[in-house]
Amino acid sequence: MMLQHPGQVSASEVSATAIVPCLSPPGSLVFEDFANLTPFVKEELRFAIQNKHLCHRMSSALESVTINNRPLEMSVTKSEVAPEEDERKRRRRERNKIAAAKCRNKKKEKTECLQKESEKLESVNAELKAQIEELKNEKQHLIYMLNLHRPTCIVRAQNGRTPEDERNLFIQQIKEGTLQS
């Protein structure tokens, strides 16, 4: 697919030599042929030239190398043509393998750390729940002790209530406490 800019003709109206100047006959190219090309067309041109050179090198290598009067396999000529590209791919694979291992190790460490944190928080939660139960029991025991003491207490409270008022308030608190629990 080719992008079309304002003022340009469509691809069907233009020959291949007009789009890609390198397809023109040798010696007919001038600087103006390349001056007004867009970056996209320049990139297409660059790839076309590279492909042309690669095809030419591969075909000449196939013609020159034979074993038992048979042409070599395409993979052999490919590795002869671009050993630096194979090396670059190998190094990239190696770096990718190392990066993937590093990522897996990092993920494993993070998972282990989160697991330890979760276990620690569950332990703290269990301790706090036990402490809550212990405090509830202590509260009930203190309310019971206060209830036993109130009938014998003759001291008036600071707010002016009598021990009987306090006792009724205490019974009400016990009822509310049992309803909440």
Curated annotation (Swiss-Prot):
Residues 88-110 are annotated as: Basic motif. The modification Phosphothreonine is found at T162. GO terms for cellular component: centrosome; CHOP-ATF3 complex; ciliary basal body; Golgi apparatus; nuclear body; nucleolus; nucleus; RNA polymerase II transcription regulator complex. One of its GO terms (molecular function) is DNA-binding transcription factor activity, RNA polymerase II-specific. Residues 86-149 form the bZIP domain. Residues 76-96 are annotated as: Disordered. Keywords: DNA-binding, Isopeptide bond, Nucleus, Phosphoprotein, Repressor, Transcription, Transcription regulation, Ubl conjugation. Expressed in tissues containing skeletal muscle or smooth muscle. Expressed in cutaneous and muscular sensory neurons. Induction: Up-regulated in regenerating neurons after nerve injury. Rapidly and highly induced in regenerating liver and mitogen-stimulated cells. ATF3 alone can bind DNA, but it preferentially forms heteromeric complexes with JUN and JUNB and does not interact with FOS. This is Cyclic AMP-dependent transcription factor ATF-3. The gene is Atf3.
